């Protein structure tokens, strides 16, 4: 669990004053999905949640990316059963058991690859043969993306405060990557990942950056958007994701 969430922070309160620009649809590739943007768009991003599910923070982030010209899909890969925000960090034996069960049975990447493949199929069916697809993931979601067997389907993968980093995964990735790390990820392992990727032609269009003043989860459910500094860095993170995909599409 420490590798998944290398911080003692729990999820933050959502931004109650914000009005979402997208909508949730019941069945997109078999999953309830938050979508923002036009179905006629050929520039599509698929976001992969963290363990806290379809949080308000990642929906707001999707809206920011849509403002820059992308259509964004946030599928509920945890199918309505994320880890409760009150359970992490665990405060009771019941919380600890809930966390142990969740991490041991719910987050193996291979459980989620077939779901992602169906979402990719749905994107192609909705947006046509000329669509280009990028993906971005938070924490555990980033691990699912870089280990996905068909990364060649994507023009790029953005990994935001990635969990379970392993340099062996670099050999599986066949597109440019953006790593946006916090102070909580293991810098040595991230550097090993980058070094392993340097022989890949996609490295030339890749970037590895660290927000040394931010914590694991600052672009997702742990972001307190009422805090001016966290809001600033949240916005900067999404701008970097946007610029990365703008350069590839």
Curated annotation (Swiss-Prot):
The record's similarity note reads:
Belongs to the AIM2 family.
Output a single Gene Ontology CC term carried by this record: nucleus
- Higher taxonomy: Eukaryota, Fungi, Dikarya, Ascomycota, Taphrinomycotina
Q: Does the keyword Ribonucleoprotein apply?
A: no
Arranged from A to Z, the UniProt key words for this protein are:
Cytoplasm, Nucleus
Q: Where in the cell is it found?
A: Cytoplasm; Nucleus
The source organism is Schizosaccharomyces pombe (strain 972 / ATCC 24843)
Query: Which InterPro entries would you find in this protein's record?
Result: AB_hydrolase_fold, Dienelactn_hydro
A molecular function (GO) term: hydrolase activity
- Tell me the domain of life: Eukaryota
The name of this protein is Uncharacterized AIM2 family protein C30D10.14
